[in-house]
Swiss-Prot record:
Record's function text: Cell wall formation. Catalyzes the transfer of a GlcNAc subunit on undecaprenyl-pyrophosphoryl-MurNAc-pentapeptide (lipid intermediate I) to form undecaprenyl-pyrophosphoryl-MurNAc-(pentapeptide)GlcNAc (lipid intermediate II).
Record has Signal as a keyword: no
Amino-acid positions noted as binding UDP-N-acetyl-alpha-D-glucosamine in the UniProt annotation, renumbered to this chain: T15, G16, G17, N127, R163, S191, I244, A263, L264, T265, V266, S267, E268, Q288
CDD domains, per the entry: GT28_MurG (cd03785)
GO molecular function: UDP-N-acetyl-D-glucosamine:N-acetylmuramoyl-L-alanyl-D-glutamyl-meso-2,6-diaminopimelyl-D-alanyl-D-alanine-diphosphoundecaprenol 4-beta-N-acetylglucosaminlytransferase activity; undecaprenyldiphospho-muramoylpentapeptide beta-N-acetylglucosaminyltransferase activity
Protein name in UniProt: UDP-N-acetylglucosamine--N-acetylmuramyl-(pentapeptide) pyrophosphoryl-undecaprenol N-acetylglucosamine transferase
Chemical reaction(s) catalysed: di-trans,octa-cis-undecaprenyl diphospho-N-acetyl-alpha-D-muramoyl-L-alanyl-D-glutamyl-meso-2,6-diaminopimeloyl-D-alanyl-D-alanine + UDP-N-acetyl-alpha-D-glucosamine = di-trans,octa-cis-undecaprenyl diphospho-[N-acetyl-alpha-D-glucosaminyl-(1->4)]-N-acetyl-alpha-D-muramoyl-L-alanyl-D-glutamyl-meso-2,6-diaminopimeloyl-D-alanyl-D-alanine + UDP + H(+)
InterPro entries registered for this protein in UniProt: GlcNAc_MurG, Glyco_trans_28_C, GlycoTrans_28_N
Organism from which the protein derives: Aliivibrio salmonicida (strain LFI1238)
Membrane topology category: Peripheral membrane protein
GO cellular component: plasma membrane
């Protein structure tokens, strides 16, 4: 007898960029009475993270093909077939109404297994350049969504799910209303830190033609080194931390953010309403540069690609950003934000459930 509650199987793994948006959609549907289960891999972050959110997870064995040697490539077809069969077994045992693919290696076999089982597949691509798995699955999916324009020619642009505390920040015009004094520069390099930001910013900020307050999130194990770099350049009052526990508070504090342009960061910055200088991670398909491009085009951000980054290029960029300009950029960022991605994807999933 079929369970009266609708069921969603989420396929996402490998990185937070895939897992966190999947959790956001899952939570939205859970609040509407849906049952949620997850398909992932045992050796990646979803194995620990997903159960902490009260969601049961099944595992399949699958790895990426890029960078593999000839021997592994030769046996890869057999491994993929095996992963599809594993996924199909889990799917037929639980019988979801819809399967949601958020990217990562696990989505490929899982999506094919769902299709073979006659279960509708919904895709969400977080980046401006579609991952290989989502490129394949887009041909069999019932609905395809993208966070930024350009990943797919005809997919609906719905943004990325953004945490609620960021979406609820006051409008930039309110935050800037009583603000004066030094420009507040927030540097964020992610949990591991961004080596190029840690090396460059302590040299850049003393050369600016206006005074600044600095909050530099340096990443695990980098706090002392970065702090010393600021001191070596004559800055003794920089706030250097390994992590930022309350990201929303950091966005609210900042006049300008200097950071990479991963998909979720770009979406958060837009929702928060903060003017940014993006230094995209170098990748052959320019994924991070393309993530940032729509905010650059709408006047919400500046971008310096890593191959063009020098101390002087960043000095010149930041020197042109006085507070009135930063308020304008922040308002443009907020105006460009899409903050209901989880609701939009959840609505599509509900429409496909029989």
């Amino acid at each position: 007898m079929k369970n009266k509650n609708k069921r969603l199987l989420v396929m996402a793994g490998g990185t937070g960029g895939h897992v966190f948006p999947g959790l956001a959609v899952a939570k939205q549907l859970q609040s509407e009475g849906w049952e949620i289960r997850w398909l992932g891999t045992e050796d990646r972050m979803e194995a620990d993270l997903v159960p902490k959110h009260g969601i049961e997870i099944d595992f399949i064995k699958v790895k990426g093909l890029r960078g593999q040697g000839l021997k592994k490539l030769l046996i890869a077809p057999f491994q993929i077939i095996g992963a599809i069969l594993q996924a199909k077994k889990h799917i037929q045992a639980w019988q979801p109404d819809v399967v949601l693919g958020m990217g990562g290696y696990v989505s490929g076999p899982g999506g094919i297994a769902a299709w073979l089982s006659g279960i509708p597949v919904v895709l969400h691509e977080q980046n401006a350049v579609a991952g290989l798995t989502n490129q394949w699955l887009s041909k069999i999916a019932k609905r395809v969504f993208q966070a930024f324009p350009g990943a797919f020619p005809n997919a609906d642009v719905v943004g990325n799910p953004v945490r609620e505390d960021v979406c609820q920040l006051p409008h930039p015009s309110e935050r800037f209303a009583e603000r004066n004094g030094p420009i507040r520069v927030l540097i964020m390099g992610g949990s591991q830190g961004a080596r190029i930001l840690n090396a460059t910013l302590p040299e850049v900020l003393p050369k600016l033609n206006h005074s600044v307050e600095i909050w530099h999130q340096a990443g695990k194990g980098n706090q002392e080194t970065v702090n010393n770099a600021y001191k070596d350049n004559g800055i003794t009052d920089a706030k250097v931390t390994e992590f930022i526990d309350d990201v929303a508070a950091a966005y609210a504090w900042a006049d300008v953010l200097v950071c990479r342009s991963g998909a979720l960061t770009v979406s958060e910055v837009s929702a928060a309403g903060v003017g940014s200088v993006f230094i995209p991670f170098m990748h052959k398909d320019r994924q991070q540069a393309l993530n940032a491009d729509h905010l650059v085009q709408c006047g919400a951000a500046k971008m310096i690609e890593q191959q063009d980054l020098t101390v002087q290029s960043l000095v010149d960029t930041l020197n042109g950003l006085e507070r009135p300009k930063l308020l304008e950029m922040a308002c443009n960022a907020r105006n460009a934000a899409i903050i209901d991605a989880d609701v939009r994807v959840a609505t599509a999933i509900k429409s496909l459930a029989k």
